[in-house]
Amino acid sequence: MMEKMLVQWREELSEELTCDILPFWMAFLGDGVHFAGRIDGRGKAHPEAGKGAVLIARMLWTFSAAYRMTGRPEYLHAAGKLRKFLALWLIDPVHGGVYWEIAPDGSPVCGKKQSYAIGFAVYGLSEYVRATGDPEALDEAAALFGSLEEHVWDAMRGGYVEALTRNWQPLEDMRLSEKDANTYFSMNTHLHLLEPYANLLRVWREDRVATA
């Protein structure tokens, strides 16, 4: 009885994912450049909204994982758009890391380096590498990892700083959001660095990743 229920739930969840959730986000993505930064609870697109690194990186992970699990080319196409967008618009070409948010025209709205967001970028890129073996995406993930280790890791205190300025200087307000505490370290950020580091190790068997 339980086995039949599990099979049924799996079929229902798979249908929900492939027929509703993923198609919704593929339609939202459009050409992969000129898409709205926000869709509200009523499904209305807001093209004037900025595009956040966390949203893009999470979508990149999602479509990369979906392609890896199903082999469906439309998911690979979506993942490719997202990886390209992340590389061209959200990775800081001057200082490394990723911008927290960019405007619709691509200019940084908030250039601070939030460790949480950089971690998600590593997570999305490493999953894309798992799905495709793309060496450029691996280089991008490795560079972000290097930025975290060079600038964010505080060896004296034994943790990763919550946030820094665009050029990796101390930041007075390090909060992830207005409802979060303004703390130097947080469990939330450390959990969301452990996850991408573990995923990166799957595709980049470097000792410095394993020991980080």
Feature locations, PLM:
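Glycan-recognition and catalytic cores of secretory/periplasmic carbohydrate-active enzymes
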Residues: 1-212
